[in-house]
């Protein structure tokens, strides 16, 4: 079970975007996330008339490792760690480590 999922609001812990918040838009693999508005780089794109794309400089969000982000707890207004709790019926749910409150699915 992934502790950080698509649609979760996260806060960046390290790097040039430290302290910024954003929403996870894509999981590249088990360890990398693409977050809206975070880790933006400028890519130089060649024009391709076959695909109908124009050339130029495009800003693009690049993947960031999940160890460099933490889930944002709206109740406390701070970053928090995620734990897994097994309920009585055997289902597993994500909870905030600080409060034990269940994380709502996005």
From Swiss-Prot:
Q: What are the record keywords, sorted?
A: Ribonucleoprotein, Ribosomal protein, RNA-binding, rRNA-binding
InterPro entries, A to Z: KOW, Rib_uL2_dom2, Ribosomal_uL24, Ribosomal_uL24_CS, Ribosomal_uL24_KOW, Translation_prot_SH3-like_sf
Q: In the UniProt record, does the keyword DNA-binding occur? A: no
PANTHER family documented for this protein: MITOCHONDRIAL RIBOSOMAL PROTEIN L24 (PTHR12903)
The entry's function note states: One of two assembly initiator proteins, it binds directly to the 5'-end of the 23S rRNA, where it nucleates assembly of the 50S subunit.
Q: What does the record note on quaternary structure?
A: Part of the 50S ribosomal subunit.
> What name is this protein filed under?
Large ribosomal subunit protein uL24
Native organism is Acidovorax ebreus (strain TPSY) (Diaphorobacter sp. (strain TPSY))
Give the organism's phylogenetic lineage: Bacteria, Pseudomonadati, Pseudomonadota, Betaproteobacteria, Burkholderiales
């Amino acid at each position: 079970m992934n502790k950080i999922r698509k649609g979760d609001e996260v806060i960046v812990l390290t790097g040039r975007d430290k302290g910024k918040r954003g929403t996870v838009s894509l999981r590249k693999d088990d360890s990398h996330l693409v977050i809206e508005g975070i880790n933006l780089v400028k890519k130089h794109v060649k024009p391709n008339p076959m695909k109908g794309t124009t050339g130029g400089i495009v800003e693009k969000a690049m993947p960031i490792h999940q160890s460099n982000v933490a889930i944002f707890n709206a109740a406390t207004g701070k970053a928090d760690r995620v734990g897994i709790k097994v309920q009585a019926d055997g289902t597993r749910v994500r909870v905030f480590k600080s409060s034990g409150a269940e994380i709502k699915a996005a």
